[in-house]
């Protein structure tokens, strides 16, 4: 696209946001309830949150750079950047937060079958299904591929037994994308990236209470859980190839950097540096303290990106424990 085309898109985007983003959705996020996570049992905190989500869903802006066929808006990367900038300019809250968007979606776009993309990506984009990630295990520590959760091959399905830990919001998730050992003889090429419903018989969760009193993480138990190898025509119950799930996990890791960057700092227009220039902050001490906080936030983002770059470089080495298990 030419510069003039992009500027026209910016003007159109700015106009759309002014018309569709309610004032209540331009306030800072104070807690998890301020962001809509979607899912089978989800509810909206306010009419404004519902209106903002529905406007973005209908426009394809919950996943703006995904193809339109899978619920996105089909934006190019430059257009997507402009949309993020314009949303940051008005401090717009995310219309939908989802591990399906940040993690599973990119993996399905790269490795998934057309049937998987049509089903799962559209469900994610519409906020219909909430996903969690099953990676870390109590006995694995930093050596993630030493996992013991095992899927016994029963022909058209697996019977899975094992335990995951530090599973973010497993108690509120509908489905899980889960690393399961399916070949005990091959450490790296004996893992399958499975997809299954958290309501399957044998799946249970136990929240882990932190010192803060919050419980964003869970232990997840799988006791004789039946995981189908297929959910219908061209919809395998796993991503990529059987016993090659490690390839999918490594690819997915690259997209965790984007999530950490987004939560750690995001667009500079929304950083505290923009806040310190507002008329209400006349106290020089407060301005200095907020400026230092902003520097810390920028440093955190830079260190997060460096961490993820180093982690991605360790292609065949054991992963350190994920920030978001």
Question: What are the roles of these predicted feature ranges?
Answer:
Residues 1-98, 118-126, 286-291, 298:
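Amphipathic, small/basic residue-rich leader segments at the start of a protein or domain
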Residues 9, 202-303, 321:
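Glycine-rich beta->alpha junctions and the first turn(s) of the following alpha-helix
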Residues 27-30, 284-287, 298-325:
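C-terminal helix-coil-helix/basic helical segment that borders enzyme active sites and/or dimer interfaces
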Residues 60, 83-88, 179-180, 195-201, ...:
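Short Ser/Thr-interspersed hydrophobic loop/turn segments at strand-loop and sheet-helix junctions
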Residues 96-115, 141:
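N-terminal glycine-rich flavin-associated loop
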Residues 127-135:
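A short, Trp-centered hydrophobic/proline-enriched beta-strand micro-motif
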Residues 149-152:
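A structural signal for short hydrophobic beta-strand segments in well-ordered beta-sheet cores
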Residues 156-157, 161-206:
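A short core secondary-structure module
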């Amino acid at each position: 696209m030419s510069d003039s085309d992009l500027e026209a898109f910016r003007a159109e985007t700015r106009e759309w946001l002014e018309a569709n983003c309610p004032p209540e959705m331009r306030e800072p996020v104070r807690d998890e309830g301020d962001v809509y996570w979607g899912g089978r049992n989800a509810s909206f905190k306010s009419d404004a949150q519902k209106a903002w989500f529905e406007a973005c869903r209908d426009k394809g802006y919950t996943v703006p750079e995904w193809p339109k066929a899978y619920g996105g808006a089909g934006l190019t990367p430059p257009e997507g950047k402009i949309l993020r900038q314009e949303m940051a300019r008005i401090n717009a809250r995310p219309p939908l937060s989802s591990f399906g968007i940040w993690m599973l979606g990119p993996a399905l776009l790269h490795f998934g079958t057309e049937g998987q993309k049509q089903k799962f990506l559209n469900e994610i984009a519409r906020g219909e299904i909430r996903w969690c990630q099953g990676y870390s295990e109590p006995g694995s520590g930093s050596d993630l591929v030493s996992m013991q959760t095992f899927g016994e091959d029963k022909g058209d399905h697996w019977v899975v037994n094992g335990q995951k830990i530090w599973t973010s919001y497993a108690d509120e998730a509908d489905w899980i994308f889960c690393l399961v050992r399916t070949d005990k003889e091959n450490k790296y090429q004996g893992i399958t990236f499975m997809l299954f419903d958290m309501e399957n018989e044998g799946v249970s969760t136990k929240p882990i209470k932190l010192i803060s009193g919050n419980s964003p993480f869970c232990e997840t138990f799988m006791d004789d859980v039946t995981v189908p190898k297929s959910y219908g025509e061209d919809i395998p119950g796993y991503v990529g190839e059987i016993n090659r799930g490690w390839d999918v996990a490594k690819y997915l890791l690259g997209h965790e950097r984007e999530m950490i960057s987004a939560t750690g700092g995001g667009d500079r227009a929304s950083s505290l540096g923009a806040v310190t220039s507002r008329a209400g902050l006349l106290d020089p001490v407060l301005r200095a303290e907020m400026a230092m906080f902003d520097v810390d936030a920028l440093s955190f983002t830079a260190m997060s990106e460096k961490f993820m770059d180093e982690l991605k470089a360790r292609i065949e080495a054991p992963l350190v424990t994920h920030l978001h298990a």
